[in-house]
């Protein structure tokens, strides 16, 4: 079977999406006029994401990238979520495609987007820039709530991060899983093309026998909380994304909102500990600002110099050889 050559370009855009520990938990299949995105459960994070919630949020990020790339290439895309969690995207070449400026602006952000784990420069994001970005991503199912340092929720969320760190850093399964996804040097990173590389973590390029015990010793609540407090203090806002339901459809919808946060040079990084620890997540759900919605993603926003980019597996390695349904 032959496929349009630009289908590979669409998948190239899709795999630039973020994922927990850069696990890249997706696989693709090609049909004559469709692409499917399926969860790759062999890459699931059973300790930090036992319900696969963040896995499906990552698939939503990949889906958004793919659909934006499809529109850029002149395709109309229609998505359908199957019961098994597979997303089927029907693609129809438009004879006279009209490119929408807002879609093109987002498409341009795909290669620029990164999870920036650095300390930010402390400059506030002007509300005149932030408000339209957030408003454009609001929907009937997903809402975005930004809190400046002066808001009481900012302190509440900071404390939730601290509590989440304390829970996770005292969980041997969490730490073992995290260590398994750390790539300790350039050779290690090049061999797997996934995981959390030493470079994106701001660590030196050292042999694993040196860096592994150092990083293992650093995985403790005191050090993590000190680091996160400083990074939160350097940020302009904390952003909590919530949804009306807690199921794969709304998790996908949540993921589709994240690319927009790259606009105007805004940096972002995940502080999702309180959404990952059940007790903390239940407390966040009680925040009046959420209006009864379910918290899905917590990020910090601000400005920072770009960090090294995480690697991605080659496109051919994430495409199944069987025909898409």
Predicted segments, located by residue:
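Acidic, surface-exposed loops and disordered segments
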Residues: 1-325
């Amino acid at each position: 079977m032959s496929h349009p050559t630009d289908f590979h370009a669409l998948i190239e855009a899709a795999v630039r999406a973020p994922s927990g520990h850069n696990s890249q938990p997706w696989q693709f299949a090609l049909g004559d006029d469709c692409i499917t995105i399926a969860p790759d459960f062999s890459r699931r994070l059973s300790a930090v994401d036992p319900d696969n919630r963040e896995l499906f949020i990552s698939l939503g990020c990949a889906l958004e990238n793919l659909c934006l790339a499809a529109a850029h290439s002149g395709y109309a895309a229609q998505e359908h979520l199957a019961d098994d969690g597979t997303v089927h995207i029907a693609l129809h070449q438009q004879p006279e495609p009209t490119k929408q400026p807002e879609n093109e602006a987002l498409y341009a952000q795909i290669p620029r987007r990164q999870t920036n784990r650095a300390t930010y420069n402390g400059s506030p994001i002007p509300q005149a820039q932030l408000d339209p970005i957030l408003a454009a991503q609001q929907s009937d199912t997903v809402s975005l709530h930004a809190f400046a340092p002066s808001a009481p929720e900012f302190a509440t969320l900071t404390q939730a991060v601290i509590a989440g760190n304390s829970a996770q850093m005292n969980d041997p399964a969490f730490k073992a899983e995290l260590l398994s996804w750390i790539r300790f040097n350039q050779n290690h990173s090049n061999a797997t093309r996934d995981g959390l590389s030493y470079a994106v973590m701001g660590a030196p390029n050292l042999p694993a026998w040196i860096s592994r015990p150092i990083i293992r010793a650093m995985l403790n609540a005191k050090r993590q909380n000190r680091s996160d407090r400083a990074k939160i203090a350097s940020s302009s806002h904390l952003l909590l994304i919530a949804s009306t339901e807690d199921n794969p459809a709304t998790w996908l919808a949540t993921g589709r909102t994240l690319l927009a946060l790259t606009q105007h040079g805004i940096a972002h990084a995940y502080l999702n500990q309180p959404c990952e620890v059940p007790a903390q997540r239940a407390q966040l759900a009680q925040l009046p600002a959420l209006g009864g919605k379910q918290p899905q993603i917590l990020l910090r926003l601000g400005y920072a110099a770009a960090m090294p980019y995480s690697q991605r597996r080659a496109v051919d390695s994430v495409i199944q050889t069987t025909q898409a349904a």
